[in-house]
From Swiss-Prot:
Highest taxon of source: Eukaryota
Residues that bear Phosphoserine: S34, S49
An example Gene Ontology biological process: positive regulation of retrograde axon cargo transport
Function summary: ARL8 effector that promotes the coupling of endolysosomes to dynein-dynactin for retrograde transport along microtubules. Acts by binding both GTP-bound ARL8 and dynein-dynactin. In nonneuronal cells, promotes concentration of endolysosomes in the juxtanuclear area. In hippocampal neurons, drives retrograde transport of endolysosomes from the axon to the soma. Plays a role in the generation of neuronal polarity formation and axon growth. Implicated in the formation of a single axon by developing neurons.
Protein name from the UniProt record: Protein RUFY3
Keyword Transport: no
Record's comment describing the protein's domains: The second coiled coil domain is involved in the interaction with GTP-bound ARL8B.
Protein source organism: Homo sapiens
Coiled-coil regions listed in the entry: 271-362, 422-463
Keyword field: Cell junction, Cell projection, Coiled coil, Cytoplasm, Developmental protein, Differentiation, Lysosome, Membrane, Neurogenesis, Oncogene, Phosphoprotein
């Protein structure tokens, strides 16, 4: 980037103030924002004169608006990409104090304000992006909930504050991309609020709406009751995206540490899953043991029942044989009563036999179920042993990774110390070099003085020689 100071020999207070203001403010219409990999580059379109110009320059407004749209789109790309990467590395729910998230909302606010028509009120002209956002509930019914919530917030007094609250609630709802796409597709409604060459009316708005889909992977939580959204100043912090020349020194070490931390988090997550699986299997084993105990008790009861039925059947057989024998020996008049008793005994015997068959069938079923449960318990025990072995191996790997992490951290600290020492040595060498350069200049000046004196002496000698002759 070229220097912004005016080429004047004697600065005046007016030019100093203008220079300071220009150094503190970056106008999107005078610079082109481009992306160099993952970094932001600001390239000056033309030389900016910092002295007051009595005749204003006449530039093409369409060109300036197109340049602003391109700059805002590139800023949105960087902001969204940086927010997603930092949120995933952080691995937790984001809140309103998170700096990349604050910058994302600032960039979105600038995108929504670009090319916004000014509405005339009693207090003057007012530009607010709350009007277009209110249209979303007519296009997407799900947005009516957050619009009503924004209107019910007691601390919001200005349309700008309501628009900022709406953006935060839409991000929490993970519907911001859907709402923006629905709004951009209705150009006939947006034309009431935006100029024809505004960002929301051009292709850049659709690109930004597509980029917002990636934000659905992050979780955000905002408490807007105590937050002052009306008086916040939406200034883009370019320092978060400008590349530092010294930032690439520890890239390799940081990448290794990041990879190790990712592996550590993966192993810990796998360990938690395995512990949960082991707990579930242990609960199943306990339940099967209780069921096995219950089945054993039921089997003992069934065996006792079978023994009782066998004894009763033997007794009935003896009684029936005794009755038959007595019928053969007794008089005929008693045979009718004895026949009835015999039929009742046979009926009772048949019922007892059927009951015995049912009990034996149930016993066989209980035995088969017990065998199946024993087989399932053996398989579960084998699975638990395998899981425990895998868990021990993973814990060993985790310990190794932790040791490697400490070793890399120590090496990184040592390398940082070496870099610091080298930088100090380099600064001392530069200081000595500067001193030697100053000494050389003094010697050269002395040499020049001596040459001049020699020339003077030669000329004086030449003048004296003819006089002697």
């Amino acid at each position: 980037m070229s220097a912004l100071t005016p080429p004047t020999d004697m600065p005046t207070p007016t030019t100093d103030k203008i220079t300071q203001a220009a150094m503190e403010t970056i106008y999107l219409c005078k610079f082109r924002v481009s992306m160099d990999g993952e970094w932001l580059c600001l390239r000056e379109l033309d030389d900016i004169s910092l002295t007051p110009d009595p005749e204003p320059t006449h530039e093409d407004p369409n060109y300036l608006m197109a340049n602003e749209r391109m700059n805002l789109m590139n800023m949105a790309k960087l902001s969204i990409k940086g927010l997603i990467e930092s949120a995933l590395n952080l691995g937790r729910t984001l809140d309103s104090d998170y700096a990349p998230l604050q910058q994302f909302f600032v960039v979105m606010e600038h995108c929504l304000k670009h090319g916004l028509k000014a509405k005339k009120t009693f207090l003057g002209q007012n530009k607010s992006f709350w009007g277009p956002l209110e249209l979303v509930e007519k296009l997407v019914p799900e947005a009516a909930e957050i619009t009503a919530s924004v209107k019910d917030l007691p601390g919001l007094k200005t349309p700008v504050g309501r628009g900022r609250a709406w953006l935060r609630l839409a991000l929490m709802q993970k519907k911001l991309s859907e709402y923006m796409k629905a709004l951009i597709n209705k150009k006939e409604l947006l034309s009431e609020f935006y100029e024809p060459n505004a960002l929301m009316m051009e292709e850049e708005g659709a690109i930004i709406a597509g980029l917002l889909v990636g934000l659905n992977v992050i979780d955000a939580n905002f408490c807007m009751k105590g937050e002052d959204l009306d008086s916040q100043v939406g200034v883009i912090d370019f320092s978060m995206y400008l590349k530092d020349g010294n930032s690439s020194k520890g890239t390799e070490g940081d990448g290794q540490i990041t990879a190790i931390l990712d592996q550590k988090n993966y192993v810990e997550e796998l360990n938690r899953h395995l512990n949960a699986t082991v707990n579930n299997l242990q609960a199943k084993v306990d339940a099967l043991e209780k069921s096995n105990t219950k089945l054993t008790e039921e089997l003992a009861v069934a065996n006792n029942r079978i023994i009782t039925l066998q004894e009763e059947m033997e007794r009935v057989k003896e009684e029936s044989s005794y009755i038959l024998e007595s019928n053969r020996k007794g008089p005929k008049q008693d045979r009718t009563a004895e026949g009835q008793a015999l039929s009742e005994a046979r009926k009772h015997l048949k019922e007892e036999t059927q009951l015995r068959l049912d009990v034996e069938k149930e016993l066989e079923m209980q035995i088969s179920m017990r065998q199946e449960m024993e087989l399932a318990m053996k398989m579960l025990e084998k699975d638990v042993c395998e899981k425990q072995d895998a868990l021990v191996s993973l814990r060993q790997q985790l310990d190794d990774l932790r040791a490697l992490k400490h070793e890399l951290a120590f090496k990184l600290q040592s390398s940082d110390l070496g870099v610091k020492q080298k930088s100090e040595l380099n600064s001392r060498l530069e200081e000595k070099t500067n001193q030697m350069a100053a000494t050389i200049k003094q010697l050269e000046q002395s040499e020049k003085d001596l040459v001049k004196q020699a020339k003077t002496l030669n000329s004086a000698a030449n003048k004296l020689i003819p006089k002697h002759h």
